[in-house]
Amino acid sequence: MYSHIVNLKSKTYLMTQTTIFSKIINGQITCEKLHEDELCIAFNDIAAQAPVHFLVIPKKPLVSLYECLEEDKDLLGHLLLTGKNIAKSKNLKNWRTVINTGEESGQTVFHLHIHFLAGRKMSWPPG
């Protein structure tokens, strides 16, 4: 089991394979899967905030964007392009992309994930 400690803005989190997302990656929990490859998995959000709401998550256990390093730039690009390709396959031309980083931003699962939301007019500011 992979685990490490991450200090995220003076709060320490232990990243283990115990998040709901790591259980999805490991096949312990089923999901409405939209895509999977060697780097990531994408699935519909069970608590959808828009008519179309899916997540793209890396298989690499990263707590948040705050933790990402220069070496993760190809992975981050892959996650975004995977989401774009899923959106295009759903014939979407407009969508919102969201990455919450840390508790104050609304991150509730401490495994990096990118939200893709569409199907309605989005308001601004979002929060």
Where are these regions (language model features)?
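HIT superfamily nucleotide-processing domains
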Residues: 2-127
